[in-house]
Every structure is written in C-alpha cells, then in structure tokens.
Amino acid sequence: MEQPKGWTWQDRAEGSIRRGTALDPSLEPVDGILAFPTAYLPQRLLITRSEEDQEAYDQELRTLRDAADTFGWQLEIESDTGRARELTPGVPGFLRAYLTTPDEPIRRESPVAPDAWRVLQRARRMSRSTMPRTSLEHVLSIDPVGLNPFTRTNPFTRTNPFTRTNPIRGAGAGGSDDYLAPGRGARQPVSWLGPAPQRGPAPKRGRRPVVAVLDTGCGMHSWLPDDIVTRHVELDGVPVGLTDDADPERYPDLYGQLDGEIDAVSGHGTFIAGIVRQVAPDADILSVRVAGALGVIDESSLLLAVAQVVELLRRHREDPSTGFPIDVLNLSLGYSHETPTDGLFSLTLYALLAKARALGCVVVCSAGNDAIDRPSFPASLWAWPGADNGIRADHDAPHVSVGALNPSAHSVALFSNVGPWVQTYAPGAAVVSTSPAFVGGEQAATRADLDGLRRETLDPDDYRGGFAVWSGTSFAAPYVAGRIAAELGTVPIEGVSADAAAKAVAAVAKTLPAPRDRG
C-alpha cells in the first residue's frame, strides 16, 4: 500500500501513542467549580492575551507559575508568535504554556508528570478566581461513528483504538455499536447508479455560494474536481490548515499494524464534500485539512485554522478582491468541556465562530456520536433554551447544531447526541457519498474464477468504485450545510447579510423532519 515518501516505522508507530489524557474531576477540587471528564493535553495550557488587559494577563501568569512550583513543575510560555496577537480584529490571541519538570529535582525528589488540570485548579484556589484567561488544551475528534473514545469510562485501554474500520462482525451488537457492523451503517463500498450532480452555468451577476469544510481534506474524485473544490488556500503567504505529506485522503493506511486496514477517518473529508456536492451541486467547496488519519486535533491547532478561515472571510467582506468568500462553515468535529456552564470555558472558539456569523456566515456543527445529551463543543455554543453557558442570543447569521436521523427519517439514530442544544436532525445513518479509490488489505471471503472471469464475493474495503456507505453526525451536518448553501443560491460577490442567512436557515429547517416519540 502506498505510503508518503520517507514514511518510517516511527511515523507508523505514532498511531499507538495516545493523544491526551482523561481528566479526573476528583483531583484538586475547587468550591463552586463542578467539573466533568474530558480529554486534554496534560503538559499544556492556553492563555488568552490582549493588549487591553496586559496587567491582568501578567498577574494570571504569575499565579500559574506559583501554582506549578508547588508541584515541583516549571511553566514556560512559548516564544511570541502570531497567535499572541489578535487572531482576527476583535478576537484576542493566545499563547501556549508548557509544563515541564526541572533538570535537577528541586526538593530532592522526582516530581510526577505535569498535569495542567491540577495546576489550573490550584491557581484558581490560590487566586480565589476562575482564572478566566486560562484553559486546558483539549483534544477534539472527528465525528464518524466509532471514533469518539473520550467520553467512555476507560477511553485509552486499547493500544490502537483508531485502526479498526469495522470491528463488529455477524449479528447486531446491540446499542449504538450496532451501527459499526457492515450492512448496519458501518463504512463499506456501495454502487452509485444515478447521474452525477448537475452543475448549472456560472451566474452572470453575483457568485456561487461557498461551503468551507474543516476536516481531513478532500481526495480526488470525478465529482470533486479542482474547479469545484479549492484544496489549498493561503493567508499572507502562510498555508491554511495542514499541508504535510501524511494526507489521509490519499494514503489510507498510515498508522497501526502493517495489515492494510484503512485508518478510521481516511476519506472522511471526501465523504463530507460529496454530501455537499449532492445537495448543493451549484456550490463551491473550500476544503481545509485540520486533522490527520487518527482523527484527533489539538485545540490550539483548530483555533489557528478557524482564525485563518475567519480572517479570509473578513478580508473578502471588506474587499472582494482579497481574502476568500465563505457563506457556510461546516465543522464535523467536537469535544466535551470539563466546565461548560456559566462561561467557565475557553471563549476563543466561540468568539471566532461569532465573528464569522457577524460577517454573514452560517456555522453548522455536528452534535457528536456518544448517544448522550451532554453539550458538545462547538455544537452547543449558542443560546439554546435553558442554557447556562452565558451566551446571549444575537441577530447574526445562525449557529446550527445537527444530530443524525436513521434512513427512515422517522427516528433519531441511536448513536446521535441529543438535547435542547441540538437544533435539528438530518440524514446521518447509512448515508451514501464519495470516497477516494482506496483498496484496503481485507479480501473477498470467497473467490472462484471461471472462463477468464474473476468471480468473488464483495471485497469489504475496495473503494475503487468511488462510493461508500457511512454513518455519523459528521455526515448530517454537511447535509444541512449544503441545503443552506443551495437555499442561498446566487449570492452577492461580497457575501450575504445576516438576515438573508437566517431566512435561508429557516427555510431549510422547515423541510427537515422533526422526529418525536409517537408511542
């Protein structure tokens, strides 16, 4: 199976190294702060910084260093980078703080490994404040069914949790794991018999709507040529998103065992782009790769990519000859925050998405696949009924959170997250869309050639036909994003108003099923 040039066993073995750790809320409890499990990087913190509150930033940094010192750890701030400045006008930048152990034990004993959660909680106790500028650096995951391991009790007990494409065989497994079985919603090849989406002529006035997809990139497919999908964009000469050779839309088996098994999210971005293409054939697509084949993303990396995309949008709104037009932003990824109430969470992602919406861009997020009602970020970053997140309603372009429906459209998929923060539901189970022409290591169960003909049963991971079935709220979100783009139709060169965006969202919402318990 093809590999990137220079790919070594060290690169492949990286897939067995867990990214992040599970938060234990019982450590360093602080009165008034109710915490829940999440996944985070134990050696890093994110600190918001703006020129207007430099004194408060300096004080918070001193407190963090004092808190780290009580454990025998050191806290170092990364050298000043573009992240320290405004990410886009009106959104403060941030710096990453690294926790390390000293070269020489300070108290004649070797300290335990650094833990950002314990430092943050102790700093809160020492300062008698919530430390509003400081947050953990969370680990986000892409959202096909079977990949969100962070909300389970023991999320890291398997050495390679991400490398099993179809782990369930035979009869249905029961519960939400039933969707992991071939023929029950798991990824598998399928034949497409209809015509390709038909694209109309370019508008004489205005332009086509643009859907931006921040995901694993977009592979090559006859439905997704370069005049429809932009796969590379720069901001001030700097590429937006990941550009390394480890492209999961080109190389299907980068991590884990040398068995040819397709990585769990390889092809994920191509599948999403194909959904947008089906429901909005006249739309253009901007594909930004923010995740690799393991399907996980560091929060700071996502923040930077979102900031770049929002800045491109802002510049285009000010001067259509610059930047890049974006009318709908699709985010099929998420995480659960440890303190999601009363504004005790990192506001940077919310501020960036709010900025995009203020510029007339609709934000569409997948709800997640944990089969729970716990609010997921960024899907729940809006003023939903009964919300205690401190977010106020506004009149900007809408923020839309999307759960998944079963093929019947009469029931919500069991794996889909639910709750008052999920605004709508759309097809997300056993969905058909585009796939790169991957050929995995599994073979047909039976082969019997005759008269020069190759005869065999279905090869479970041969995607050379270009299409697949797959499940996840990941795929419900782009359905809605594409429908909104199609409803917008031809748009002004500079973009649409927030009012026009809201009307398009409302029109689409009226046509989506509203499943209810009918007894």
Predicted regions and their residues:
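Extracellular S/T/G-rich loop segment that most often corresponds to the catalytic His/Ser-adjacent loop
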Residues: 235-240, 244-245, 381-489
